[in-house]
Amino acid sequence: MKTKDLREKSVEELKALLDEQQLNQFRLRMAKATGQLGKSHEVQVARKTIARIKTLLTEKQGNGQ
């Protein structure tokens, strides 16, 4: 997901998206560990998306200064 798209979301939407992405990352890691994941780069993409969301949450909550 692009940062531009994430910036348009509210704090509540970002928190919900963060929960969803963390669950997705967990599922991807389990699939990778059991050898069922065909596209191993998806784990890295999920991790970077989570980092983007956390960064934007920090900025929007006023702690980024």
Curated annotation (Swiss-Prot):
It comes from the Bacteria. SUPFAM superfamilies: Ribosomal protein L29 (L29p). One of its GO terms (biological process) is translation. CDD domains: Ribosomal_L29_HIP. Keywords: Ribonucleoprotein, Ribosomal protein. Gene3D superfamilies: 1.10.287.310. GO terms for molecular function: structural constituent of ribosome. GO terms for cellular component: cytosolic large ribosomal subunit. InterPro entries: Ribosomal_protein_uL29, Ribosomal_uL29, Ribosomal_uL29_sf. Pfam families: Ribosomal_L29. NCBIfam families: L29. Belongs to the universal ribosomal protein uL29 family. This is Large ribosomal subunit protein uL29. It comes from Acinetobacter baumannii (strain AB0057). The gene is rpmC.
